[in-house]
Amino acid sequence: TSHIARNLGEKLTMEQCLYAVMLESANECAYAVAEHVGQKLGGDYRTFIDRMNKRAKELGCTDTHFNNCNGLPDEDHWVSAYDMALISAEAYKNETFRMIAGSPSYTLPKTNKCKAEYPCHNHHKMIYPFRGDSSHLYKYCTGGKTGYTTVANNTLVSFAEKDGITLVCVVMDAATPVSYTHLTLP
């Protein structure tokens, strides 16, 4: 699983956790956010997951059931590409989400348990030249999220804006992180 090696009792802000989740797929931060929000809703971690499922239904999702907060394989957890596009389009309406999802990088500051800063980098190759590879940068890409599990393979949500139009693209079950390198974008 992906993580940023945070320690029990370490103090991070919600914003710092969201950057860690979106840029580094930090599962420990995803769980911390879910537990915190679930408690704010008067419950616990499961309360957060139940709220995710309720919100998905409100958005019109018909082929989605969340059973965890990080998307790791679970036989009672699934989402279709169409439903992920609905969820992503709704998330994109939020200014904070757009800022985080479109950030090439972010540095977590020192904390009460970690005496060094932690650099986070967006793994979305249209946003950040990950590992020095700038061949996939796309100037109209405004954000996105990569993902990978052995069950789901490579997944990608991308946002792009051009000529006043915002596009949401969802790719699931890709064999490699760069499956479509033979295509060019205008």
For the regions a language model picked out, list residue spans one by one.
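Short pre-catalytic segments that frame enzyme active sites
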Residues: 1, 184-185
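Domain-terminus/edge residues, biased toward the C-terminal soluble/receptor-binding domains
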Residues: 61-62, 73-78, 82-183
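Active-site-adjacent loops and short helices of periplasmic peptidoglycan-processing enzymes
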Residues: 1-82, 91-95
